[in-house]
A protein has these predicted regions:
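Flexible loop/turn segments at secondary-structure boundaries
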Residues: 114-116, 155-156, 224, 254, ...
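Conserved DEDDh/DEDDy metal-dependent 3′-5′ exonuclease domain
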Residues: 70, 77-83, 87, 91-95, ...
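Acidic, Mg2+-coordinating catalytic module of metal-dependent nucleases/exonucleases
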Residues: 154, 159-230, 249, 427-502
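Long, highly charged low-complexity segments
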Residues: 251-309
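Conserved RNase H-like, two-metal-ion catalytic cores of nucleic-acid enzymes
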Residues: 51, 85, 106, 285-364, ...
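Small-residue hinge/turn detector
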Residues: 237-240
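Short beta-strand-loop-alpha-helix junction that forms the active-site gateway
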Residues: 109-120
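Metal-dependent nuclease catalytic cores that hydrolyze phosphodiester bonds in DNA/RNA
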Residues: 1-103, 243-269, 274-276
Length: 503
C-alpha cells in the first residue's frame, strides 16, 4: 500500500487518524462531507484552475496517470498540470511543473492568503513540498526550485481580474531543503504504519490537544475518553502542561477535576457548573451589561460569502460579500418584536442594496445587538472602505453595537450545557430549548454562504432557487430571533434574582 501526500500530512497531525483514514474510511467519513467542506474543495479547484492561467499552455494529466506523466517528463514537456509520480512506497500529484531549460520548477497552489495563521501554514506547506520533492527525486526527475503560489492578501480588484497581481509566487526552496532528511524518515514511518493490519493501541497524540485541535476520529480511537472531557475546558489547548497533567493523572471527565488543581477562573466556573449541574450567574456584571442596552433594541445578524476569487470592484481574496441581514427590533420593555429582513439574489454587487436596506430597517437610535461584534463591525468597516460616501452611517452603526456574546465569553453566565463554548448554536438550546436550528434546511453559516452562491451563479433551477431563498430567510431570521430570546432569558435571570439548577 502506497503512502499518498494527503495521508502523510494527516499522519503528521495524528498517526492513528492516518491509519483509520486508510483502513476504516467508513469511520473517517462517518458523516458525509458537509456543505462547508465541499465548498472548500470547490474553492481549491477553482483557484488551481485559475492559477494555471499564470502558466499557460500546459498539458493537463489525467487523474492517476503516472505512466503518461513519466513519458511527458522524459520528453521535457514545458508545462504540466497535475502530473502524477509514484515509487514503490509513495505517490503524489503536483499542481504545476515548469521546465526551466535545465530542471523542472515545482509550483504548489494554495487557496489561501496566509493571514494570521501564516507561520503555521507555511510549515505545513513546506512539508507538503518536501514530500513532493522526495517523490520526484525518487523518479529521477531533475528538480529545480520549489515555489508556493497563493492568493495575494493585498490585491484589490478594480473590476477586472489581474492574474499577475491576484497570485503571489514565493520561493520555498530554502525552507524545504533543510527538512528533507527528517521528512524522508517521517515518510518511512508513516508508510510502515499504514501497512499495519490493526489500529495501534490508544491514546493518539491528540489526547494532549484541546478539543478543537483533535483529529476527526478521536472518539473512535480513544473510546475511554468521555464525550465531555477536560479537553473541552475553555482555552485548555493554550495550556498544554495543564492538560498533560490532567490526562497523565487519569483525570478525563470535567467533573473529576480536583478542587485543588490549578485552573483559571473561567475554567473553574465551567467545572463547577458541570459538577453541580447548576447555572452560574455573575449577577453584578450581567446587570450592568443589560442596563447599558438602550431601546429601541435591534438584534442584527449578517450573512456573507467569502469569495476566494474577487467578483466585484473593491474586493480582495476571501473578502466577505454581505448579501443578507435579519433584524428583530423591540421598541420598549415588554414590546412585541418587529422583524425586518433583506436578501439580495442578483448577480451584481450587493453592497449598495445592502446598505440602503440597512438604512431603512435600522432604528435611528438605540442599541444594535449582535453576536461576535468583530464580524459585523468588520463587514461595516469594509463596506465603508468600498463606499466612502456611506462611511458616516456605517461608523454610526458600529458605534452603537453591543456584543451579546460578551455575556458568555466573559462568563457572566455559565451553563453546564455550554461545555465551554460561546457559539449561539450552543447557548440557544441551553437557555431557550424551545428554539432550535435542527428543523431548518440550513443550520449553519457555511451552508448559508454556499446556498447563496449557488443561487446567484445559476447553479440551481428556478424553483430550487426560490426555495433556497426561503431557506436563507428562515435561517438568518432564527439567528436574530435567537439573540432576542437569549436576551429575554438573561433579563429573566436578573429579575428572578436566584441561581437555578440546570435542566
Amino acid at each position: 500500500m502506497k503512502l499518498s501526500k494527503t495521508n502523510y500530512l494527516v499522519y503528521r497531525e495524528c498517526a492513528h487518524n492516518a491509519w483509520v483514514k486508510v483502513h476504516k474510511p467508513e469511520v473517517y467519513r462517518a458523516e458525509p462531507l458537509s456543505v462547508f467542506e465541499q465548498a472548500i474543495i470547490g474553492v481549491g479547484n477553482d483557484v488551481d484552475v485559475r492559477a494555471r492561467q499564470v502558466f499557460p499552455g500546459g498539458i493537463l494529466i489525467r487523474r492517476g496517470d503516472a505512466v503518461g506523466t513519466a513519458q511527458l517528463v522524459a520528453e521535457r514537456a514545458h508545462i504540466l498540470y497535475q502530473p502524477v509520480f509514484e515509487t514503490d512506497r509513495y505517490t503524489t500529484a503536483c499542481d504545476i511543473l515548469v521546465w526551466n531549460g535545465a530542471a523542472y520548477d515545482l509550483y504548489e497552489v494554495k487557496a489561501s492568503t496566509g493571514g494570521e495563521e501564516r507561520n503555521a501554514k507555511d510549515d505545513l506547506y513546506a512539508h507538503d513540498l518536501a514530500f513532493q520533492a522526495l517523490v520526484l527525486r525518487g523518479n529521477g526527475v531533475p528538480l529545480g526550485r520549489l515555489h508556493l503560489v497563493r492568493l495575494n492578501a493585498g490585491y484589490v480588484s478594480d473590476g477586472t481580474r489581474d492574474l499577475g497581481r491576484l497570485f503571489t509566487r514565493e520561493d520555498f526552496t530554502s525552507r524545504v531543503t533543510p527538512l528533507l532528511d527528517a521528512v524522508a524518515m517521517e515518510m518511512d514511518a508513516a508508510h510502515d504504519l499504514i501497512q499495519l493490519r490493526a489500529l495501534p493501541p490508544p491514546p493518539c497524540a491528540c489526547i494532549y490537544k484541546g478539543r478543537s485541535s483533535q483529529c476527526t476520529t478521536f472518539a473512535h480511537i480513544n473510546p475511554g475518553v468521555p464525550d465531555y472531557s477536560v479537553h473541552d475546558l475553555t482555552r485548555i489547548g493554550a495550556s498544554p502542561k495543564k492538560l498533560k497533567a490532567l490526562v497523565d493523572g487519569g483525570i478525563l471527565a470535567v467533573t473529576e477535576v480536583p478542587d485543588d488543581f490549578e485552573l483559571s477562573d473561567p475554567q473553574r466556573n465551567q467545572v463547577e457548573a458541570a459538577r453541580h449541574r447548576r447555572l452560574h450567574v455573575a449577577r453584578a456584571p450581567l446587570e450592568a451589561f443589560l442596563a447599558a442596552i438602550r431601546y429601541p433594541v435591534a438584534f442584527l445578524d449578517y450573512e456573507t460569502f467569502p469569495c476566494a476569487l474577487p467578483r466585484f470592484a473593491g474586493y480582495g481574496p476571501f473578502h466577505h460579500v454581505p448579501f443578507q441581514f435579519s433584524m428583530h427590533v423591540v421598541t420598549e420593555p415588554g414590546g412585541a418584536p418587529i422583524h425586518r429582513e433583506f436578501l439580495y439574489t442578483g448577480a451584481d454587487c450587493p453592497d449598495m442594496p445592502f446598505i440602503d436596506a440597512l438604512k431603512r430597517a435600522i432604528p435611528a437610535e438605540g442599541s444594535i445587538v449582535v453576536w461576535n461584534a468583530p464580524f459585523e463591525k468588520g463587514i461595516n468597516a469594509k463596506l465603508a472602505e468600498r463606499r466612502p460616501q456611506e462611511r458616516a452611517f456605517l461608523d454610526t452603526v458600529n458605534g452603537r453595537v453591543v456584543d451579546l456574546m460578551d455575556v458568555f465569553s466573559g462568563q457572566m453566565v455559565v451553563h453546564p450545557e455550554f461545555r465551554g463554548r460561546t457559539s449561539i448554536k450552543w447557548v440557544l438550546p441551553a437557555l431557550v430549548p424551545r428554539l432550535s436550528y435542527k428543523g431548518l434546511a440550513i443550520q449553519e453559516g457555511a451552508t448559508a454562504s454556499d446556498t447563496w452562491n449557488r443561487i446567484v451563479t445559476g447553479a440551481l433551477e428556478p424553483d430550487a432557487a426560490r426555495q433556497a431563498a426561503q431557506d436563507l430567510l428562515a435561517y438568518c431570521g432564527l439567528d436574530s430571533l435567537a439573540m432576542l430570546e437569549i436576551w429575554r432569558a438573561l433579563l429573566g435571570m436578573v429579575a428572578a434574582r436566584e441561581i437555578r439548577e440546570a435542566g
